[in-house]
C-alpha cells in the first residue's frame, strides 16, 4: 500500500478513512515537523498513536535535542491568550492543560453579573492565571520530566507521579467553576440543582448563591394584570387588591390602585358578574365610545354614534348618551338662529368691539365709505387712462362743476374729457368726427425725405418699411 504523503506532512484530511497507509517513520524526522504547538483543546492522543506507537519510538519522536527549546517556547513563543495548553509536538497530548476559551470567561462574567457576584468571577480568573503560570514554571524547571509526563500519557500509564502535583497543590478548585462541587455532567450548573421550571423553588447558580429561577412562578404582582384566586368569570371569590399596571382588573374585578395611563379607575362591575345579561346591541360590548383605559364619561361628553349606552366588557360604566342621528345640535342640523360656518352673512354686519360700526367691504368699482373716509375724496382708477373726481356715486359724475378738470393718471398720459366717465376705463369707441380730425392732423405733419422715399418705393425693403400713416398725397 502506498504511504500517504499528506500524513507525513501532518495534513491528511481523511484520517483513519484514508485509502493510503499512515505509517510513522522510524527516524521520526519528517512525521512531526512543527514544534512548540499551543492548541486550545485538550484532546486525547490520536488512535494511531495508541495502537502503533511503542516506547522505543518515543525516543525518536521526542529527541533530547528538543528539550532545550522548551524554555524558548514558553518564554518567546507563548501565545497572547494565557489560558492555553502546550505540547512540544503536534498531534501529541499537551504537556500541561489549562485551556479556557474567551467564550467561557464571557459566559462566567454574564452569570456573575446576573447574580451580582463579580467578586467570585474575578477570584476565579485569578486562580486560573496562577495555575497556568505555575504549570509553565514547572515545565521550565525540569524539561526532561515534562517529556516523561508526555510518554506516560501516550502509553496510557496512570500510576505515575506528575510533575504538576506540587504546582497545583495550592489551586484545588481548578476543575471547579466558582467554589462549586465538581460534577461529571458538562452542564454541571444544572446537574444537582432543582428544575428551573419548578414552581416556588430556588435554584443554586454556578456561583453558589441561591437565586430565583427566571421561569419560577412566584406569588408576586404581575406587571400586566392582577393575581386572582378564582375564575375571573364567576366573580364569587374575592380578589386581591394588588394594583394593576394598567389600572383595571380583568373582567370585572374591582381595582383600587392608580392606572398607568392616567385614568381614574373606580370599582365598576362588568356584564359578567353584575347580573345583567349580555347587551342586545349589534355592536356587542365594544360599541361604546369609552375605552377600557379611559375615565368614566358623563352626559356632557360627546355622544356615541351608535345609539344608546351598553355595558362595557372591561368594567367601565358609561352614562346615558344620545345618538348623533337624533335631534341634536350637530353641524348637519343647525337651528335657524345659529351662525354660518364660514363667517357672517351679507344681511348682517359684525359689531366692532371698539364701538365703531364696521362698513362692509367695497364692491367692484365702488369707493370705500366709512367714518374715516372724508366726503368728495378723489380716488384714482387702476384701469382707466384718465382719473376723475368721483362723488358718492361710483358710476357717473353728474356734477357740472367737475368737468374740464385735468388730473394725473396712474398708468399714462391723460386727456381732458368732458361729460360722463366710462366706468371701465377710457372710451374705446371713436366717432366719425374724431377720425376726420385724426386724418387732418397728418396733413400738418412734416415727413422727412427718407420716409417719403419709403412711401414712393415700388417694393418693400427690409428695414425701410413705413410704420406710420401715409401723407395725404399718397392717399
Swiss-Prot record:
Origin: domain of life: Eukaryota
Biased composition (Low complexity): 183-204, 243-252
Transmembrane segments: none
GO MF annotations, alphabetized: zinc ion binding
UniProt key word Cell cycle: yes
UniProt entry keywords in alphabetical sequence: Cell cycle, Cell division, Metal-binding, Nucleus, Zinc, Zinc-finger
Any one cellular-component term (Gene Ontology): nuclear pore
Positions annotated as zinc finger (C3H1-type): 1-25
Function, in words: Involved in the cell polarity process where it is required for the correct termination of microtubule growth at the cell ends during interphase.
The protein, known as: Nucleoporin-like protein amo1
Gene (name only): amo1
Amino acid at each position: 500500500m502506498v504511504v500517504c504523503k499528506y500524513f507525513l506532512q501532518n495534513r491528511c484530511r481523511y484520517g483513519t478513512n484514508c485509502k493510503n497507509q499512515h505509517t510513522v517513520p522510524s527516524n521520526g524526522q519528517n512525521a512531526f515537523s512543527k514544534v512548540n504547538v499551543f492548541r486550545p483543546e485538550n484532546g486525547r492522543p490520536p488512535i494511531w498513536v495508541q495502537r502503533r506507537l511503542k516506547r522505543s519510538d518515543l525516543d525518536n519522536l521526542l529527541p533530547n535535542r528538543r528539550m532545550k527549546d522548551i524554555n524558548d517556547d514558553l518564554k518567546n513563543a507563548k501565545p497572547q491568550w494565557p489560558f492555553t495548553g502546550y505540547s512540544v509536538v503536534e498531534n501529541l497530548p499537551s504537556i500541561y492543560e489549562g485551556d479556557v476559551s474567551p467564550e467561557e470567561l464571557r459566559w462566567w462574567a454574564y452569570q456573575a453579573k446576573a447574580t451580582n457576584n463579580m467578586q467570585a468571577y474575578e477570584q476565579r480568573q485569578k486562580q486560573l492565571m496562577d495555575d497556568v503560570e505555575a504549570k509553565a514554571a514547572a515545565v521550565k524547571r525540569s524539561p526532561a520530566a515534562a517529556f516523561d509526563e508526555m510518554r506516560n500519557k501516550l502509553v496510557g500509564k496512570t500510576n505515575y507521579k506528575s510533575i504538576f502535583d506540587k504546582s497545583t497543590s495550592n489551586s484545588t478548585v481548578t476543575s471547579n467553576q466558582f467554589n462549586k462541587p465538581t460534577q461529571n455532567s458538562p452542564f454541571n450548573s444544572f446537574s444537582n440543582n432543582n428544575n428551573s421550571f419548578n414552581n416556588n423553588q430556588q435554584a443554586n447558580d454556578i456561583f453558589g448563591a441561591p437565586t430565583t429561577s427566571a421561569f419560577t412562578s412566584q406569588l408576586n404582582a404581575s406587571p400586566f394584570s392582577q393575581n386572582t384566586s378564582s375564575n375571573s368569570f364567576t366573580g364569587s371569590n374575592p380578589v386581591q387588591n394588588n394594583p394593576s399596571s394598567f389600572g383595571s382588573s380583568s373582567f370585572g374585578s374591582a381595582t383600587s390602585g392608580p392606572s398607568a395611563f392616567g385614568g381614574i379607575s373606580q370599582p365598576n362591575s362588568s356584564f359578567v358578574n353584575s347580573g345583567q345579561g349580555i347587551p342586545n346591541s349589534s355592536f356587542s360590548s365594544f360599541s361604546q365610545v369609552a375605552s377600557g383605559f379611559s375615565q368614566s364619561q358623563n352626559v356632557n361628553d360627546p355622544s356615541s354614534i351608535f345609539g344608546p349606552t351598553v355595558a362595557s366588557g372591561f368594567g367601565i360604566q358609561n352614562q346615558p348618551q344620545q345618538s348623533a342621528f337624533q335631534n341634536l345640535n350637530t353641524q348637519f342640523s343647525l337651528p335657524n338662529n345659529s351662525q354660518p360656518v364660514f363667517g357672517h352673512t351679507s344681511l348682517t354686519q359684525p359689531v366692532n368691539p371698539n364701538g365703531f360700526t364696521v362698513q362692509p367691504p367695497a364692491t367692484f368699482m365702488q369707493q370705500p365709505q366709512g367714518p374715516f373716509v372724508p366726503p368728495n375724496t378723489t380716488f384714482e382708477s387702476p384701469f382707466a387712462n384718465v382719473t376723475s373726481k368721483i362723488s358718492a356715486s361710483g358710476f357717473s359724475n353728474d356734477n357740472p362743476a367737475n368737468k374740464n378738470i385735468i388730473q394725473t393718471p396712474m398708468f399714462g398720459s391723460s386727456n381732458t374729457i368732458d361729460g360722463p366717465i366710462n366706468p371701465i376705463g377710457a372710451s374705446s369707441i371713436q366717432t366719425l368726427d374724431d377720425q376726420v380730425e385724426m386724418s387732418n392732423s397728418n396733413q400738418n405733419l412734416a415727413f422727412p425725405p427718407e420716409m417719403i422715399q419709403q412711401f414712393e418705393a415700388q417694393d418693400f425693403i427690409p428695414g425701410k418699411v413705413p410704420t406710420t400713416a401715409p401723407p395725404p398725397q399718397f392717399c
